Structures are given as C-alpha cells and as structure tokens.
C-alpha cells in the first residue's frame, strides 16, 4: 500500500495542543507519537507494551492516551510513545474515527460502523 500523510491535531491531558503531520500506517496497531512530541504534549504513560518494529526488532514502548482531531472529528485514543519514529496514524485510531484507507487515491474515506 502506498504511504501518504495527513494533518491532525493532538492534545495532551493538560490541554497542550500541536498540529502535526501523521504518516498513515495501517500496519501500526496504535497511533505512534515521537518522544519529543509526547513530552511537549505532556503525555502521561499508563503502562508499557512489547512491540515489534518494522524489520522484526523488538522493544517495549510506553502507552498513553491522547486526543486526536482529524478532518473535524475528534477521539481519545491510546498511543505508543516512540523513541525514534515519525508520527504514525495506526489502525485503532482510524477505526475509532470510522475511517479507512483508499490506497489508490491515497486518502482517508469514511466507513460505517458494524454491530454484531
């Protein structure tokens, strides 16, 4: 799938907000926030989680919650805090916003929710 970027707004628990560019990556489970950005947003890690990084490397990354606003819709979502990674828009955040990836047009498209 071709990669593309979108602009979003992240807000931490103290109200600090930043506009940022997010690389859309459905292979990432969660939203990924670089350590430096997480510090500016004053994100508070709640736990840590083992992760497998592209290339098969294993690590343990902190997990926090952040408010994400994208195209007018807003959701609180878990995020990984990564030492050396770009900001990534992962699958859980996309699903929480009821968005899917159109890989041909390289854009996000709204989808319906499903119930059992």
Question: Where do the PLM segments sit?
Answer:
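Pepsin/retropepsin-fold aspartyl endopeptidases
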Residues: 1-116
